[in-house]
């Protein structure tokens, strides 16, 4: 009888572990999510800053510009004069200096002008006509957005040229005429009807309403405020905005050798810089202390470089008008901190009296709206047009934005309001329910990417660069622009500094750090990756190793 | 930007490693770099668990599970058998834990290194017998808590990297999972060399060290940036190359993430800082010569 042996197999393995669903161990799963970056959240025009910087980093400049002009038709303008709250919010600010967003925007905006890139034309043409009253930043932005939606738009402008503060208020050395003309020409090429030298009064409104489906009021605030101590009838006393406007129209106001500017905001410093370029010595008297002047810090630095003397925390008590000169009795003050921000209540400090003498005085203490008669047709409060969150006035079909409404007086804020009004007008005309895009930003603001969510290991320190400045002696010779744009190399290296907070750039870290090979690259997906549900154990390494907070872990319940 | 690592799909999903396991991540880059024409040798360890519950395997290559003391001897036998059969392309890799390398398997490894046997030996070093409940090994660092050193280990970690370099083997490298590209590059480099190649990979054990599930790569990088575990290569016991060294990051940033160090007082933290600084300076001198 033959002996039988038990056969021992040479290979014991009969299969692979990938038949085991380790995903059942999990209590949370990673979700790819485009999240709100702090810069985007702070941007007055709701600009998708990480998106266009990412495109610039890839040298896709036309695409970057196209992403910019979705929200703002004037990147070359805002790249120069925006107060850039984005940089104040930038997560990199806590690390090695905020990304130079404003300078990057200028480079792309200028490139668009030099390359002659044109704005996209509307894809549909609607029959409805919209009247935009006021051709400043808010009105032009609203007209642009409405035109993109296909509406027929007419802009009514009381002055001979469009632009408002951009044409008449900002000195040429901050925004050259060529740049502004280029930006405007490109916008008007979309086919917008313009009626310049056309002042719309309150009693014109009802006739406008017959011809137009909706009205946007963007009248601005060009009337310079005055101070009771000063007689504005005297030829030696100038109003700030009017002074800037005259110079921008090409006049040369006769100021004399010594000019005193009253005010501490951006307009006051623009007035001071303009007077310096006209050859005068300039002193600025401001109520606020030096470290709390309302002007932007870089504007203050430039003014000081240009030899403007700043008397911060000072108030004019008495004005002595002579035939050739004005003598100002001044006193040092501190501001009463018990008053809310924006309300100035100076407390004179006795014994600090001093005297300043000047050949002319320019008042730059703020601007008011001109709303005579408008209170009979719409609700006005504190000299401003009352509007709701959607910028609708009390009168159906009439919307308002920019400086004529209670908004921060920045050009970018006005551009943002014009855009917001355009979507409100569109909603009003199409009778949609209010779920606009601008509201979604507010809803998501809780989910802003925080500094702690950025994985610094992936971002070696890299110094921030700033725009260069023309040497002072050269600056004072003329009204040429003083800030020097980034060059190509600077633009490349500085755009690389962007963390792209909350915006996936397909770095593949989530893929490489998964011990379970549960992350799959898939370029056909908007989120670029998918999670293999059957294997993911929910460890969260992909979330932790994402350099920019674009993956979040979501708890799973009821499994 | 980002990592670029070429992988062959040898390591499978569905393996039994804990969520976030650094050792599984290390195995991914080791076997996916070596490719399917490789024979693995694995002693008892977490690696044996991750290799798969019989009869399933997480690695699409032959794996021989040997005894705890015999990884290097088993690898020697397989490498010599392949040579005797005229096979000069199949690679042999032993993948063992620190218990199976620093302690129990050390004799066979040292003698194989002395004979310059032709295989790759990779130690996945999680600084203790983590598979059996976190007892101390000779790799456990000074003052770290383990189940068998409840007041903290009274002696320092054995410097196996330098011991192996002192065998004057063709290639010795240190690596860790927070630097996956560096790890894969070192495995690829070892693959292209003949003789005994040794890589010690620091693989933080989430459970044994007391770490969050997502903290493996982070603590691994802190080990490097604090100077606890510099990443470097030594060729023929002589030529030293530094890849990633100390950035002067204070040791407390590394220790405070780990529950195994939470009993430390300030004086002990400073003591560890001094030891780490001294070790880093001593090692650093070798890169300049």
Regions found by a protein language model. Give the residues of each.
Chain A
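Rossmann-like dinucleotide-binding cores of NAD(P)H-dependent redox enzymes
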Residues: 152-196, 247, 272-318, 435-447
């Amino acid at each position: 009888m033959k002996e039988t042996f038990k056969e021992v197999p040479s290979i014991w393995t009969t299969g692979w572990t990938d038949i085991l669903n380790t995903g059942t161990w999990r209590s949370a799963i990673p979700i790819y999510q485009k999240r709100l970056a702090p810069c985007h959240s702070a941007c007055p025009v709701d600009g998708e800053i990480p998106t266009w910087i990412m495109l610039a980093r890839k040298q896709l400049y036309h695409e970057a510009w196209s992403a910019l002009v979705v929200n703002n038709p004037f990147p070359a303008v805002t790249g120069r004069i925006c107060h850039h709250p984005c940089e104040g919010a930038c997560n990199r600010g806590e690390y090695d200096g905020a990304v130079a967003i404003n300078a990057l925007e200028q480079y792309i905006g200028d490139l668009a002008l030099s390359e002659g890139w044109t704005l996209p034309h509307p894809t549909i043409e609607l029959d409805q006509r919209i009247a935009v009253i006021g051709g400043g930043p808010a009105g032009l932005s609203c007209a642009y957005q409405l035109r993109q939606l296909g509406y027929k738009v007419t802009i009514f402008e009381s002055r001979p040229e469009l632009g408002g503060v951009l044409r008449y208020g900002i000195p040429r050395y901050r925004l050259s005429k060529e740049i502004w003309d280029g930006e405007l020409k490109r916008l008007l090429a979309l086919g917008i009807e313009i009626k310049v030298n056309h002042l719309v009064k309150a009693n014109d409104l009802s006739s406008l309403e017959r011809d137009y489906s909706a009205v946007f009021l963007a009248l601005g605030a060009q009337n310079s405020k005055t101070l009771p101590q000063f007689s504005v009838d005297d030829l030696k006393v100038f109003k700030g905005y009017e002074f800037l406007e005259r110079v921008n129209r090409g006049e040369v106001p006769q100021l004399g050798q010594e000019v005193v500017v009253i005010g501490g905001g951006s307009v006051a410093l623009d007035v001071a810089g303009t007077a310096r370029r006209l050859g005068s010595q300039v002193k600025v008297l401001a109520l606020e202390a030096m470290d709390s002047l309302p002007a932007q810090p870089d504007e203050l630095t430039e003014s000081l470089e240009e030899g403007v003397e700043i008397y911060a925390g000072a108030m004019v008590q008495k004005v002595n008008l002579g035939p050739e000169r004005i003598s100002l009795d001044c006193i040092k003050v501190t501001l009463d901190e018990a008053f809310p921000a924006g309300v100035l209540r100076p407390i004179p400090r006795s014994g600090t009296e001093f005297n300043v003498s000047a050949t002319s005085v320019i008042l730059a203490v703020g601007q008011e709206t001109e709303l005579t008669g408008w209170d009979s047709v719409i609700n006005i409060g504190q000299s401003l047009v009352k509007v709701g969150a959607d910028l609708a006035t009390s009168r159906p079909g009439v919307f308002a934005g920019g400086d004529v409404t209670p908004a921060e007086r920045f050009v970018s804020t006005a551009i943002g309001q014009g855009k917001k009004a355009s979507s409100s007008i569109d909603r009003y005309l199409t009778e949609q329910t209010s779920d606009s895009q601008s509201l979604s930003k507010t809803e998501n603001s809780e989910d802003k990417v925080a500094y702690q969510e950025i994985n610094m290991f992936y971002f070696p320190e890299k110094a921030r660069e700033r725009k260069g400045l023309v040497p002072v002696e050269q600056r004072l010779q003329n009204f040429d622009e003083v800030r020097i744009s980034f060059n190509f190399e600077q633009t490349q290296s500085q755009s690389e500094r962007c963390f792209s907070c909350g915006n996936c750039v397909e770095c593949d870290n989530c893929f490489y750090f998964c011990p379970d090979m549960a992350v799959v690259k898939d370029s056909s997906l908007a989120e670029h990756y998918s999670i293999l549900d059957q294997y993911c154990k929910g460890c969260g390494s992909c979330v932790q190793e994402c350099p920019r907070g674009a993956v979040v872990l979501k708890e799973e319940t009821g499994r | 930007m980002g990592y670029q690592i070429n992988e062959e799909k040898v390591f499978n999903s569905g393996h039994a490693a804990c969520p976030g396991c650094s050792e599984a991540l290390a195995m991914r880059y080791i076997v996916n770099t070596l490719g399917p024409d490789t024979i693995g040798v694995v002693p008892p360890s977490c690696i044996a668990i991750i290799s798969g519950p019989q009869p399933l395997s997480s690695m699409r290559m032959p794996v021989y599970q040997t005894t705890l003391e015999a990884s290097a001897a088993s690898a020697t036998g397989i490498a010599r058998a392949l040579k005797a059969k005229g096979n000069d392309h199949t690679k042999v890799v032993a993948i063992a834990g620190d218990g199976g390398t620093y302690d129990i398997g050390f004799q066979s490894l040292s003698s194989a290194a002395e004979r310059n046997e032709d295989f790759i030996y990779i130690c996945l070093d999680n600084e203790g017998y983590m598979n059996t409940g976190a007892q101390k090994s000779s790799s456990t660092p000074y003052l770290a808590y383990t189940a068998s050193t409840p007041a903290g280990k009274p002696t320092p970690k054995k410097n196996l990297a330098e011991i192996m370099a002192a065998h004057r083997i063709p290639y010795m490298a240190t690596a860790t999972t927070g630097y996956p590209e560096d790890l894969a590059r070192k495995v690829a480099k070892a693959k292209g060399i003949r003789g005994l190649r040794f890589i010690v990979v620091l693989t933080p054990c989430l459970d044994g060290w007391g770490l969050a599930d997502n903290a493996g790569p982070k603590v691994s990088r802190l080990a490097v940036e604090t100077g606890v575990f510099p990443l470097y290569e030594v060729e023929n016991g002589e030529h030293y190359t530094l890849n990633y060294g100390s950035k002067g990051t204070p040791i407390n940033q590394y220790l405070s993430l780990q529950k195994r160090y939470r009993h430390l007082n300030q004086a002990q933290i400073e003591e560890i800082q001094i030891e780490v600084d001294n070790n880093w300076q001593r090692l650093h001198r070798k890169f300049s010569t």
